[in-house]
Each structure stands twice: as C-alpha cells, then as structure tokens.
UniProtKB/Swiss-Prot annotation:
<protein>
    <recommendedName>
        <fullName>Phosphate acyltransferase</fullName>
        <ecNumber>2.3.1.274</ecNumber>
    </recommendedName>
</protein>
<dbReference type="InterPro" id="IPR003664">
    <property type="entry name" value="FA_synthesis"/>
</dbReference>
<dbReference type="GO" id="GO:0008654">
    <property type="term" value="P:phospholipid biosynthetic process"/>
</dbReference>
<dbReference type="InterPro" id="IPR012281">
    <property type="entry name" value="Phospholipid_synth_PlsX-like"/>
</dbReference>
<keyword id="KW-0963">Cytoplasm</keyword>
<keyword id="KW-1208">Phospholipid metabolism</keyword>
<comment type="function">
    <text>Catalyzes the reversible formation of acyl-phosphate (acyl-PO(4)) from acyl-[acyl-carrier-protein] (acyl-ACP). This enzyme utilizes acyl-ACP as fatty acyl donor, but not acyl-CoA.</text>
</comment>
<keyword id="KW-0594">Phospholipid biosynthesis</keyword>
<dbReference type="GO" id="GO:0043811">
    <property type="term" value="F:phosphate:acyl-[acyl carrier protein] acyltransferase activity"/>
</dbReference>
<keyword id="KW-0808">Transferase</keyword>
<dbReference type="GO" id="GO:0006633">
    <property type="term" value="P:fatty acid biosynthetic process"/>
</dbReference>
<comment type="similarity">
    <text>Belongs to the PlsX family.</text>
</comment>
<comment type="pathway">
    <text>Lipid metabolism; phospholipid metabolism.</text>
</comment>
<dbReference type="Pfam" id="PF02504">
    <property type="entry name" value="FA_synthesis"/>
</dbReference>
<keyword id="KW-0443">Lipid metabolism</keyword>
<comment type="subunit">
    <text>Homodimer. Probably interacts with PlsY.</text>
</comment>
<dbReference type="GO" id="GO:0005737">
    <property type="term" value="C:cytoplasm"/>
</dbReference>
Amino acid sequence: MTRLTLALDVMGGDFGPSVTVPAALQALNSNSQLTLLLVGNPDAITPLLAKADSEQRSRLQIIPAQSVIASDARPSQAIRASRGSSMRMALELVKEGRAQACVSAGNTGALMGLAKLLLKPLEGIERPALVTVLPHQQKGKTVVLDLGANVDCDSTMLVQFAIMGSVLAEEVVEIPNPRVALLNIGEEEVKGLDSIRDASAVLKTIPSINYIGYLEANELLTGKTDVLVCDGFTGNVTLKTMEGVVRMFLSLLKSQGEGKKRSWWLLLLKRWLQKSLTRRFSHLNPDQYNGACLLGLRGTVIKSHGAANQRAFAVAIEQAVQAVQRQVPQRIAARLESVYPAGFELLDGGKSGTLR
C-alpha cells in the first residue's frame, strides 16, 4: 500500500475539532500508510492531540487557518470571504499537490463552490454532484446522486449525473452494465417535473447507458436499480429521511421492552433477540456510510455530514482513502473521454444539444 496524504478541514461541522481530531487519530490507528494535514486553529487542535503517541504525531501536521466558514453562511458570501479559512486552505493543499484529497464536514454550498473554483470540473461536466453508495436488501449496492450539491437541476445536469453515476458504478463499485433510474413521484412517463421528463428522453438515446426509467423513493433500498439520479434538494431530503427512519428502527431494537417486568427466561430471550436483530440490521447504520464524494472534479473531495460523530467522520476519512486508491477522478475522466469523445454531444428530440 502506498502512502497517502489527506487534508482535513477539522473546524467544519457541528462539533468541529472535538469530533474531527479524535476521528483523525482513529484513522491513523487503522491505516499505517496515512498522513493527515489538520487544517484549523492550532489552539483548538493541539490539546486534543495529547493522547497521540510519537508514531501518530510523526504522521500529523497542523496547518494553521485564520477563520472558519459558518455552516449557515450563504455560499456566495462564504466564497468571497474564504481566504484563510480552514475549508479553502484544505482544498488548496489538494490543488497544490500537497494532499491527495480533502475531507470536510463544513458548509456544503461553500465546499461545492470552492472545490469547483479551485480544483475545476472534469472536461464536459457542468457541475459536480455529491454521490454516495448505499446498501440494498439484495445485498448489493446502489449509487445515489445528487445528495445536495445542486438544489436546482435542469435536464442537462441530470443527464450528466446519470453518466457519472453509471461510470462510477461500473468502474469503481464494479457493477457490470449498471442499471440507471431517475427518482420520480411515479413510474408513468407523464409523471414528474419537465426537467425529469426531458432528462429521461435524452437518456433513452444514449446506447452506453442502461436506462430503466423512473423509480419511486420507497424503492431506494430494494435493489431495483444500481444508480439513482435526482436533484440535490430531493436527494438530500430522501437520504436524511431514510437515515432518520433507520436510526429510529435500530434504537427501537435496543430499547424494546425496557422497564417492564418479565420472567427471567423472557428477559434472556428478549436480549438474545435484540442482539441478533441488531447484528442483522447493523449494516444499515448511517454512520457506516458517512462521506459523500463530490463527483465530477479533477481532485478528490469528500463531504461528511455536519452532525457526524467521531466514528462517522473516521468513515468519511476512509472514504477519501478509497477514492484516492481507486483513482476515481482519473478513471471517470478516462471513461468519459473514451465513451463520449465528442464532448457529450447528444440528440434531444431531433435538436442538436450538448452537455457542456
């Protein structure tokens, strides 16, 4: 395994260094080839490194940052005032080649805008999309995008997301001829917004895309599709709703029957069932899938949930490691160029169009 260097925006997220720094130490424990650049306020970071041993410290470097982009800041204002911020400096380390990826739990809009500004989109891609890979009930995986990078999406952007998601599913997740679907309010052709119907019409004309039509949100985890495409607003709401339901379900498994008097054998049976069911459904725990890749950039950027705990942020760091090792941007760029050498020129309803 080759050595990797990641830049962490340790000031981002709801909890800042109190979560991100312990998560960084956890990541170092699990990967001896990993070096981390901790970007943020040294006064807030240093006390949290007290438990780090000398070997861990040799693979850590604090990069001082002057400010933090607030989670509630408007993206346009945040970008204009971003110089010296932990988020921008972490991205600049990737741009300069000092780090191979950036991980941040900070303001999504600001991260999207700064990443696009500093790292640039791949040739032919208008706007990057946040993508994650979720488990489904058939014991496989589903690629889902966009998860919040782009609130408003036209049909061109949805088609681009479908292309990138299909390439990611085939090249990285290793799903041959992945099925692609658009998230909609029904499976009928007449359902949905104009942008969704227009994107559907274009996807039907692309031979290299295994487009299967519309899918409803209640089928997200059924395994009916390998790639699910939607606008960022819908994707973000869908993902967080699913995560909330899963957390409630897992919590109920642990707490069911507490405080009630039972005979000893019923208590033993209850505890056995709780442990068995918890193990059975533990793979659905959202913490295990924290970290969405900002797909479509020339560099690797991972967005963690703002409310991520230590375990979840450590998972986001591991997602960055895997994205770098699998050369996600390079493989997507190479595949896009080979499959769409004309710059994604398409025919849409008899009219010449482009996805640039």
